[in-house]
Structure formats: structure tokens, C-alpha cells
């Protein structure tokens, strides 16, 4: 038995009906977006599992034509992350754009050269949020 099977044997309540879970999540997404009056969603895609799952669920909920995926790398971002993000976009078949955040981030931190990596990471997250709102 592999570790996941062992865990599920000890805690059977962790088992999920994948089809039902996807149906419930996509229905919830549609209902919440419809409340806003929007018919299309914009989603930041990083190449990680969280954004890949969100991308899959949004494509299921709104159809590929109802999703815009946005990749927002920084010059020090892992090339593999951008590659993974682009692969996820290709698999689900949605429209995508890439916005390089390097110019904005570097210009901002030129005034704060001693900023910690945590502070830089937080600024990048806020910059990405601003870009998503502006699209």
C-alpha cells in the first residue's frame, strides 16, 4: 500500500467523489460570477498546482472562451514555472496573455535597495493583483 492509500485506509472520510467535487465547485464558480454580472473570468496563472486547478475549474465552469489566463513572470521567476503555466493554458485551451512585471518591480525597488526577499515577494503579489484588475 502506498502512503496515500494508507492514509485513506485510516481516514476514509478523506475520500472524495472527484466528479461530484468538480460539479459542485464549477457550479459555485458560475453562481458567484453571475452575481457580479460578469460572463468571463480573468485568472492569474503561475505554473503552480493551485492556479492550474483554478484554471481547470474555470474552463469547466465558463468554457475556454470564458476565461483569460494571465502569466505575470518576474525576471527571477523560474523558467519552469512559466513553462508549466503555458502548458496548463494549452491543455485547457483558453486565451492567455503574458505581462512581464520586471519593469514595474525593478523601478519600485530602485528606491528601496535593501528590501528583503519577503517584501519583494509581497510587492510582486500586489503588482500581479493590480494587473489582473486592470485587465
Where are the regions a protein language model picked out?
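ATP-dependent adenylation/nucleotidyltransferase module used to activate substrates
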Residues: 1-135
Amino acid at each position: 500500500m502506498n502512503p496515500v492509500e494508507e492514509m485513506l485506509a485510516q481516514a476514509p472520510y478523506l475520500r472524495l467523489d472527484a466528479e461530484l467535487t468538480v460539479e459542485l465547485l464549477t457550479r459555485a464558480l458560475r453562481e458567484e460570477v453571475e452575481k457580479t454580472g460578469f460572463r468571463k473570468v480573468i485568472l492569474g496563472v503561475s505554473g503552480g498546482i493551485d492556479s492550474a486547478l483554478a484554471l481547470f475549474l474555470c474552463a469547466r465552469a465558463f468554457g475556454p472562451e470564458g476565461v483569460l489566463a494571465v502569466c505575470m513572470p518576474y525576471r527571477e521567476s523560474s523558467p519552469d514555472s512559466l513553462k508549466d503555466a503555458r502548458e496548463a493554458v494549452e491543455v485547457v485551451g483558453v486565451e492567455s496573455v503574458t505581462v512581464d512585471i520586471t519593469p514595474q518591480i525593478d523601478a519600485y525597488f530602485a528606491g528601496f535597495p535593501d528590501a528583503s526577499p519577503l517584501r519583494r515577494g509581497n510587492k510582486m503579489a500586489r503588482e500581479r493583483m493590480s494587473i489582473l484588475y486592470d485587465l
